[in-house]
Amino acid sequence: MTILLGPNGAGKSTTIKSITNLLQYKGDIKINGVANSSLDAKKGFGYIPEAPVLYDLLTIDEHVEFIGKAYRCENYRALADEYIALFKLEDKRKKAVRELSKGMKQKVSMLLALIISPKTLLVDEPMVGLDPASIEETLQLFVRLKQQGVAILISTHIIDVIEAIWDSAYIMDHGRIVAHVRKEELKDKSIKEIFFASVEGDEHEHTV
């Protein structure tokens, strides 16, 4: 599980959006050796944005049908049932999403990314709007997905949230990668120490 770690404005979301082709960029981006602009690559990754992109008038079930059919997924309904139960949204699935709280909308965004059975999951600040119990459930879900072979890239500025689950971290500052750390290589230092040693503390307010 790979983390893009950096203060607000470091370029984490820009990086995620570039990978998903939501922003124009210079150079080449490849996923498993395949250009990210190719249809195969696009079908292979799921994207969970920081701010959920949903249709206010559609219900959860209608969103599921729209995404499942757009991606031509075979078992999307069964997966949707699984994640709706996991996120405790059973009694909300017939409601228009405009009636849902911010945290619930974030959960809907997650389940829509997961019902396509992505090989790669790109997650931008996933804990925004979630209560502590939901954060723990989400972390456990990411660990389970990793064990199932899903490659996960998470951007965050909150170190403590990802401390227990990360394997590899790229620390960003001012649009650049300033450090790359593997958990297995850490000895006496913590990821938090490396983070603060790598970024310019005078210009950013850091959340730990």
Annotate each PLM feature.
Residues 132-134:
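Helix N-cap at the start of a conserved alpha-helix in ABC-type nucleotide-binding domains
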Residues 121-125:
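Catalytic Walker B motif of ABC-type/P-loop ATPase nucleotide-binding domains
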Residues 156-157:
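H-loop/switch region of ABC-family ATPase nucleotide-binding domains
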Residues 96-100:
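Conserved ABC ATPase signature
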Residues 65, 69-92:
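Conserved ABC ATPase "signature" region
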Residues 27-41:
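Conserved ABC transporter NBD signature motif
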